[in-house]
Regions:
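N-terminal lobe/hinge region of extracytoplasmic solute-binding protein
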Residues: 1-26, 34, 56, 120-121, ...
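Surface-exposed binding/hinge segments that line
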Residues: 23, 33, 67-109, 129
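Extracytoplasmic/peripheral linker and loop segments enriched in polar/acidic and small residues
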Residues: 235, 273, 317-332, 346, ...
Length: 454
């Protein structure tokens, strides 16, 4: 339904969308030239006023949005004429361009509180109706600037149960499921008359560590946990190969990814040695008594609980008794934001990782909740310094150097323990064709999908 000024390509760099050009005449100024002739769903043309309204909300102190943190450096946004917009920064911020490829999407000038009841965008589909906890109905927008969709519209159904989604797909009441079937159910469709599309995804599963915890603030304990986890086994058996072992928050597709950063291998003997060094010797040899006890909070989703059980067993093998506690996601998330945890397991999803500035929002010392996502209260002055240098750098090569150095330190400090990056998976009925999955796994490609027999 909506578009941003820019999109991201397969290499996660920005590419034109509603904007056709971006100029950066000085470190504090970005000039956007809009694509002409772009129509909103109600027929009026996109202009600079709509862009100014949308981004003006990001710097309005009274406006509440989870996306405002990405625009902390934005000072002002000004319409120069109908098709040109000037963004002025408070300080140099080299990651600003990629922020224009993420949320917020552009909305019409003056959109108010009732906008959610009948949203209007510039995307390939327009809103028809919405039923809470049931479905969203979208119709093709024939005047879409990127070409009208090749189908008659989309109905997005809400099916909260994994098994139900699989059964509905099997019997034909739905045509397609994207990234919403667990590996065991995907496996049931293999070798049958269904299309299964896969692509390397960005979603990132990790253990978050409370760096203020008296036990876990010892890096030797964190490393002992890292060496005790067999990621390859989790990927192969639990994920059925629909993931790859992760090395850090920056995905391998990203231009700033450093393939040489420190990585944990599966080494339970090294784990036991580190626990000995940290003052947690084995109290009874091969007996049942643990070296220490820790707790892990997870959501009560089945996949999360199964993975936690596997990790629990792997840690038990080195003498760590892991108390796994599962909650409704909202309850668990509130605990995490408030620092009420020793460890937690969550995922970063898709587009959040398209630019390495995510490292600042997650690991910079002052980015603790509610200001940012440093939920474990990680604090390393050298990482802060490197991220400041990366943010002020004027070339991609400079940024990559500083981000690479920061990644190395973060990996060795282990405030996160990486588990896997998801493989994007779409399972479609044989009547569909033209499906392509981009790295973020979003629904943009639906406009090119056709359905035979209709």
């Amino acid at each position: 339904m909506f578009n941003q000024l820019f999109d991201t390509g397969e290499d996660l760099r920005p590419k034109p969308m509603l904007a056709e050009r971006l100029d950066n005449p000085d470190p504090l100024t970005y000039l956007v030239t809009l694509r002409r002739g772009v129509k909103f769903h109600d027929g009026h043309e996109l202009t600079a006023k709509d862009v100014v309204f949308t981004y003006g909300q990001m710097i309005d102190p009274s406006f509440v949005s989870p996306f405002k943190g990405a625009f902390r450096s934005l000072k002002s946004v000004t319409a120069l004429d109908y098709y040109h917009v000037r963004f002025t920064l408070k300080e140099p911020f080299s990651a600003f361009a990629i922020q224009l490829a993420g949320p917020p999407a552009i909305v019409p000038d003056g959109a108010g509180p009732d906008f959610a009841d009948h949203p209007i965008g510039t995307g390939p589909y327009k809103f028809v109706r919405f039923a809470v906890d049931d479905q969203v109905v979208l119709a093709p927008f024939e005047e879409y600037f990127g070409g009208a969709p090749r189908n008659n519209g989309v109905i997005i159904r809400v099916l909260p149960d994994d098994t139900m989604r699989g059964l509905e797909l099997q019997k034909g009441s739905i045509d397609l499921v994207v990234n919403d079937l667990p590996p065991d159910i995907v496996h049931q469709f293999e070798g049958k008359d269904f299309h299964i599309a896969k692509s390397p995804g960005l979603d990132y599963s990790y253990l978050g560590i409370n760096m203020l915890d008296p036990v876990l603030k010892d890096k030797r304990v964190r490393h002992a946990i890292g060496y005790a986890i067999d990621r390859h086994a989790i990927v192969e058996y639990l994920r059925r190969g629909l993931a790859r072992p992760a090395t850090g928050l920056i995905p391998s597709q990203a231009w700033a990814y450093d393939p040489d950063i420190f990585q944990f291998t599966y080494d339970p003997n090294r784990s036991r040695q580190l626990l000995d060094e940290a003052g947690y010797p084995d109290p009874d040899g091969d007996g049942p008594l643990p070296r220490l006890r820790l707790s892990l909070k997870v959501s009560n989703a089945e996949e999360s609980r199964l993975q936690a059980t596997v990790i629990q067993q792997q840690l038990r093998d080195v003498g760590i008794d892991l108390d796994v506690r599962s909650y409704e996601f909202a309850t668990m998330y509130a605990d995490v934001v408030n620092g009420n945890f020793q460890m937690f397991n969550m995922q970063w999803v898709g587009g959040a990782m398209v630019d390495p500035d995510i490292l600042r929002r997650v690991f910079y010392s002052t980015q603790t909740p509610p200001a940012g996502y440093n939920r474990g209260h990680y604090n390393n002055p050298e990482v802060d310094r490197l991220l400041d240098l990366a943010g002020a750098a004027t070339t991609e090569a400079e940024r990559k150097k500083y981000y690479g150095a920061a990644q190395q330190i973060i990996a060795e400090d282990a405030p996160y323990i990486s588990i896997w990056n998801r493989t994007n998976v779409a399972v479609a009925r044989p009547t569909l064709s033209g499906l392509h999955l981009n790295p973020t796994g979003d629904f943009e490609a639906l406009k090119d999908v056709t359905k035979s027999g209709v």
